[in-house]
Structure formats: C-alpha cells, structure tokens
C-alpha cells in the first residue's frame, strides 16, 4: 500500500508543478518575449507488479519556440527573426558574465540616454552598451543597424541559443549547464513585437488535461489509504 501511495503522490506532485507552469503561461500569454517552461518528467513505478506508472518532475525545460507577433507601429519596437535573441546586460559580473538574452523587443531610451530592452541595457554585436545624447534621433535598420541621426553607430547584438536554457523572469534567458549562445547576425522587423509562445487557449486546454491527471492521482491516493485501513481492520479482527 505504501508503494502505491508513494507512486500516486509522485504523480500528483508532478501534475501540481505542471499546473503552476501552465498558470504562468496563461498569465503571460500577452507578455512580449515570454517563453514557456515545462516540468521534465521521469516515469516512476512501484515495485509491486500491476501498479500504474506515474510521472515525477525532476526539473524544468524552456520552450524556445516563437510566439505570435503583434503590430505596434512603434519604430523602436523590434521583432528578431525566428530563433534569434537580443543580448542585454544584467550586471557586470553575474551569471553568464552578466549577459542575458530576450525576444522582448520593446526598445526604449531611459532618462540617462541608455538604450534598453526588457528593462536592461541593450548590447551591440560588439558587446557594448548604447548611450545616446538627449537630442539624438534613433532608428533601427532591417539588419539591426543602430542609426543615430542617419549614421550607423553599431548593430543590435543577436545570438542563437542551444542546449539547456534557463529563465531569469518571464522573458530573460541564460544558457544553463551545457547550453551556449552563439553570435548570429539576423534581420529584425520594426514596429512589431513577439507575444508569449503559449496562447491563452493552449494554456486552458493544457490546464484541463493536467487537472484531470492530478485528480486521478489524488483519487488513487485515497483508494490506497482506504485499502490500507481495511487491511488494518482485518488484522485486528484476526
């Protein structure tokens, strides 16, 4: 009985984590650059034959697939080509050398003249930040060129991500163990951004399915407990 309860509990815990992830997807369906994450499962079997197999969550993975695009008309909004990510500075000595990557292309210039994306300083293809004068007029070219008053001062830093990728918030990504970021020149579309890569409808369908699996695991736990209680009662009678 104990094995059955353990296996069922592992399944319920895994589905609970999945539901939390789906809820995050649902909340960020319209968040530019958001990337969904999913628990990674392994199959758990009780030693006793005849018991069902249940999944157990052992980690999480990031879904890098491209989301739907939305037209904004803002000339500083950029949509990198599929599979490309903008480079931004997170700190001077943090994880991955203080560099993270995002598809949140809502570029803006703060009060100090720093070009930012996802709230972080944007990096050029040379790994430098972009600092603008108060009267500078910035435009973005189709290949990511940074044009100030018509003169190119650099190019948006873009990379492709491979291997294990971890999230730092809704839209910031860094290579995990065995992962890497490779510099990659690419085109950008201006006046548009990418939304979350799981639609609200997809998330609601996923939630219904995960909830059913969670309920099934909880019912199995209840059934095993009742069987254990009955066995104890029979032992007392004898």
Residue ranges and their predicted role:
Residues 1-238:
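Amphipathic alpha-helical polymerization modules
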